[in-house]
Amino acid sequence: DIWVNTLGLLNAQDWNPGTISFETILHEIGHTLGLKHPFYNSDKPDTATLPTSLDSIINTLMSYTYKDLEGVEGNEFSFHPTTPMVLDIAAIQYMYGANTSFHSGNDTYRYSDTGTYHEALWDAGGIDAILYSGAAPTFVNLNPIHGSFIGQPVFVQSNGVNVGKPVPNMWIAKGTIIENAITGTGNDILIGNGIANLLDGNLGIDTVLI
């Protein structure tokens, strides 16, 4: 069970997706499912840990570390994860098995340049597509356990100020195959996964890697 104190400070918290409070709930749900913190704990020295390079919330909600790909750290994100991240999904599936009926049809995941996203996709099957609409350049990588930069940029923040570079904010979980990607009118980068992909950059000077 998860209990949340509704008195005092927590009574004024914003619990909407993208907030640190919503991320905290996901973190605590991770504990109820058996997930542990990935960092060293001197009280439990024999507990398995992740390498420092992977100990980041962009990889697992069970981390306490907010950092970009170059290691610049802060104390939160400008927009927090709204789903378990790729290592969380992999660990849960290792313990309980994958949900093979979740998004098993032909699904389209829609994004825009005005939206803000921070999520990992688990898709069990079908012929699926990433559909991005907008003029801002975007970067879409269809390979599992890889991140994309899509929609409004998400930053690590230190006391409310953006630091470092934007972080990948849309990830594809291990075992998920997304076949197609269609982007907007900006100068986009699309990277395929070798699964008979349709990669369409529409307008703009695009780069497509297959």
Predicted regions located by residue number:
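Short pre-active-site segment immediately N-terminal to the catalytic Zn-binding motif
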Residues: 6-25
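Acidic glycine-/aspartate-rich tracts in secreted/extracellular proteins
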Residues: 7-10, 35-39, 67-69, 96-100, ...
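The catalytic-center signature of Zn2+-dependent metalloproteases
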Residues: 19-84
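Active-site rim elements
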Residues: 74-82, 115-117, 165-167
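Surface beta-strand/loop "capping" patches
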Residues: 99-129
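Acidic/polar low-complexity surface segments
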Residues: 100, 139-180, 210
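Hydrophobic "rung" positions of tandem beta-strand repeat architectures
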Residues: 109, 121, 130, 140, ...
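Extracellular, beta-strand-rich repeat scaffolds characterized by small/acidic residue-biased motifs
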Residues: 125, 134-135, 144, 182-187, ...
